[in-house]
């Protein structure tokens, strides 16, 4: 395939699996338009749905220490989810962070500020650094293009395992 860029976004043929429609729009943009956008309501209807969800979670977790658990990387997305859950939804989330050896000082600082600012609890699971390095080296040697798989697998499995062990039913992502 010759070089091509989506007529709607910046995705291009550097993604070897990308496909374009007859108008030059990539499959990612088309998927967003047909699948995500019709269900994406940031207005009054979305706020009402979020409030209803919060009330259901609160009713379901009466008498428990936490309403939900949120995986926290220290980046923008998970930090915003934590803010929305605690401040907008009025939930009592437990923030769950996995230290797989790659924490930057900025991420650690972001996490500390967020926890202090929201007044919520944080649990950090520390992954064995030697095992993580061995996995990452194995993925590199195997030529696997997605080098985040070892960390992502550790993050999600630790999060869900902790939630199950501690009977925290609601996971917010």
Q: How would you name each of these model-derived features?
A:
Residues 3-173:
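ATP-dependent adenylation/nucleotidyltransferase module used to activate substrates
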């Amino acid at each position: 395939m010759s070089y091509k860029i989506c007529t709607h976004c910046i995705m291009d043929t550097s993604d070897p699996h990308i496909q374009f429609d007859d108008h030059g729009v990539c499959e990612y943009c088309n998927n967003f338009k047909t699948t995500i956008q019709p269900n994406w309501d940031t207005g009054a209807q979305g706020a009402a749905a979020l409030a209803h969800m919060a009330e259901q979670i609160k009713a379901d977790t009466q008498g428990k220490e936490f309403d939900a658990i949120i995986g926290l990387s220290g980046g923008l997305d998970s930090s915003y989810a934590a803010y929305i859950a605690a401040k907008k939804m009025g939930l009592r989330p437990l923030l769950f962070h996995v230290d797989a050896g790659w924490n930057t000082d900025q991420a650690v600082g972001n996490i500390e500020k967020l926890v202090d600012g929201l007044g919520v609890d944080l649990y950090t699971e520390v992954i064995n650094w030697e095992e993580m390095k061995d996995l990452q080296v194995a993925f590199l040697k195997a030529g696997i293009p997605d080098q985040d798989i070892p960390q992502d697998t550790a993050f999600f499995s630790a999060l869900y395992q902790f939630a199950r062990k501690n009977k925290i039913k609601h996971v917010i992502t």
